[in-house]
Regions:
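Immediate post-signal-peptide N-terminus of mature secreted/exported proteins
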Residues: 1-18
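Generic signature of mature, soluble extracytoplasmic domains
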Residues: 11, 21-22, 35
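Mid-length scaffold segments of soluble, non-membrane domains
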Residues: 18-20, 39
Length: 99
């Protein structure tokens, strides 16, 4: 959800960019956690490629946005949220940068 939220914010707000190497490192660390819990690379890839799982992640992301007073359909609110996340240096903010 963290990567999905950061990605949506960076795509919706022209004045916020993504720290793509950080996002890739974070994604790789999540894969390592899954491997350490016994999941195979094939299982991990199937999960990541699943349309149903992607829909669940989008729904959780949108609920997070709503809880923060933003909307996935309102670019201005996502910009405000993005700057707040950057200022807090949250997990989402760590993956974003002001341009």
């Amino acid at each position: 959800v963290i990567i999905a939220a950061a990605d949506k914010i960076r795509r919706s707000c022209d004045t916020i960019g993504g720290r793509l190497f950080r996002a890739q490192r974070y994604a790789n660390s999540l894969k390592e956690v899954a491997r350490s819990r016994g999941y195979s690379d094939q299982q991990i890839d199937a999960f990541l490629d699943s349309k149903a799982e992607r829909a669940k992640v989008r729904e959780k992301r949108n609920v997070y946005f709503q809880n923060q007073g933003a909307s996935n359909l309102d670019h201005a609110s996502l910009c405000v949220l993005g700057y707040a996340e950057i200022a807090r240096n949250s997990q989402i903010g760590y993956l974003l940068k002001a341009r």
